[in-house]
Amino acid sequence: MSKAAIAEKEKLVDAFAEELKAAKAILVINYLGLTVEEVTNMRKDLRDNDVKMKVIKNTYLRRAAAKAGIEGLDDTFVGPTAVIYTDNADDITEPARIVSKYEDDFDVIEIKGGMLEGKLTSKEEIKELASIPGREGLLSMLVSVLQAPVRDFAYAVKAVAESKDEDSAE
């Protein structure tokens, strides 16, 4: 292999290592069996939510993970592998939610494992995480809970006012 080709591959590994280092959530999946259209749709859904998906040779993944200081994912870099990751600290559940949706829709996708905020995460933990609503969903639930007492009080005041109006009309 020429020195230029080796240097190009080293650049690829270094660039990916930097992306992995910045990632708040990393998922490793087996995507074998998806059609090109299905992979394209999944990539679009991921991109729309500020999540990236890369398919890179497993040897490059191992090297990039080692350079990024990520340990424990080497056993997931076997067979057809895609790495899904985000550096968005606001919602680290989004990659898990999107991949779980596709895993449910297409039996061929398999979540191999991942890392969330530097902690090794199993497939089961990722599935649990996917069931948690996103940041926006949690905020809307919080607002709804906070509004409930005020809304109930407003209904009570309105009911009292209406009953007084009925009493004065009689």
Swiss-Prot record:
Keywords: Ribonucleoprotein, Ribosomal protein, RNA-binding, rRNA-binding. One of its GO terms (biological process) is translation. The gene is rplJ. This is Large ribosomal subunit protein uL10. Belongs to the universal ribosomal protein uL10 family. It comes from Lactobacillus acidophilus (strain ATCC 700396 / NCK56 / N2 / NCFM). Pfam families: Ribosomal_L10. Part of the ribosomal stalk of the 50S ribosomal subunit. The N-terminus interacts with L11 and the large rRNA to form the base of the stalk. The C-terminus forms an elongated spine to which L12 dimers bind in a sequential fashion forming a multimeric L10(L12)X complex. PANTHER family: 39S RIBOSOMAL PROTEIN L10, MITOCHONDRIAL.
